[in-house]
UniProtKB/Swiss-Prot annotation:
It comes from Deinococcus geothermalis (strain DSM 11300 / CIP 105573 / AG-3a). One of its GO terms (cellular component) is cytosol. Keywords: Cytoplasm, Ribosome biogenesis. NCBIfam families: PRK14645.1. This is Ribosome maturation factor RimP. Gene3D superfamilies: RimP-like superfamily, N-terminal. Coiled coil: none annotated. One of its GO terms (biological process) is ribosomal small subunit assembly. Belongs to the RimP family. It is found in: Cytoplasm. Required for maturation of 30S ribosomal subunits.
Amino acid sequence: MNNNATHNAPNLRTLAEGVLQPLGYEVLDVQVQNPGRRPIVVIRMDRLDEQPVTVEDLETASRAVGAEFDRVDPIAGEYRLELESPGAKRPLTRARHYERMLGLKARVRGDGHSFTAPIKAVDGEQVTFDVGGEDVTLTVGTFQGNLAEFPDRHR
């Protein structure tokens, strides 16, 4: 294994995106868990066509990312690679993610804010939340957002 490798999630994300985007997938989040021992690289992904992620999608993505990580060798020593669908705590990282989840509650942290509130509107990169009857508008990329409730249907 590569002795100069790093557990740098942004570098791993870049590698994963380069492999998954041409296959029709979007990387939502990359985390390196248990970095002091045998690291676990967790990649949360979605389909670019916004259809539900299937087991077959996860298998395809896992094989493709695994092959690229084997080729590039970005992590020193042994590690475990896990790919998963967004799930109930879906990361919201782009304006279109908020648009897709309009009306649902999001958990927001950063930019001096910490709240859970419904997504009220999206205008370009501006997302407006209904926080206790008051509008709070934030710019995508200046805060972290996750879906705080599971939609009753696929969006």
